[in-house]
Amino acid sequence: MLSLATAQNMRSLFLAAPEQLFPLLPYNSRADLVDYAEANMTARVTNLLGGVSTLLELKSDFMLLETTASSTVQMKLLPFGNENIVCVVKSVSAEAEDSRVYFYDSHWNRLNTDDLFTMPEIREFFLPSDTIGHYIDMCDIYLVSLK
């Protein structure tokens, strides 16, 4: 597996990513997706669940992958000090979309997200301070979509 220090573009990062980051797509499937995208073909493969995964966008520093019909993974290469880190946003859609953000260092070690990004709190989505409690009480579940 390549480290981020060796792999400085999204193609290489996607191929070098640990399999647990993409449990539905083993290395060969990811390699096929990249090959199809670079050949300007529809980048689509059958994933390990028998569904379809599609590489929707592949740039030197960004990737958008539809892992299933209801889930996506976005990866963005970010400068951080004198090295790069990778931001990974995993989203799941049902009636609403929910996202989680992860950061990785040059050796694919997960970084503490709290040091790099603060998830918005539900209170930040409502303006009138006298009605916040009312709306919070109405929310059964707190979902956030990030892009």
PLM region spans:
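Short, solvent-exposed coil/turn segments at beta-strand boundaries
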Residues: 79-85, 145-147
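Short aromatic loop motif centered on NTY/YTY
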Residues: 114-147
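Short, hydrophobic/aromatic-rich segments at coil-to-beta transitions
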Residues: 60-63, 83-87
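Short, surface-exposed beta-strand/loop "edge" segments at domain boundaries and coil↔beta transitions
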Residues: 71-74, 95-98, 133
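Terminal domain-start segments
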Residues: 6-78
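Mid-length scaffold segments of soluble, non-membrane domains
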Residues: 84-119
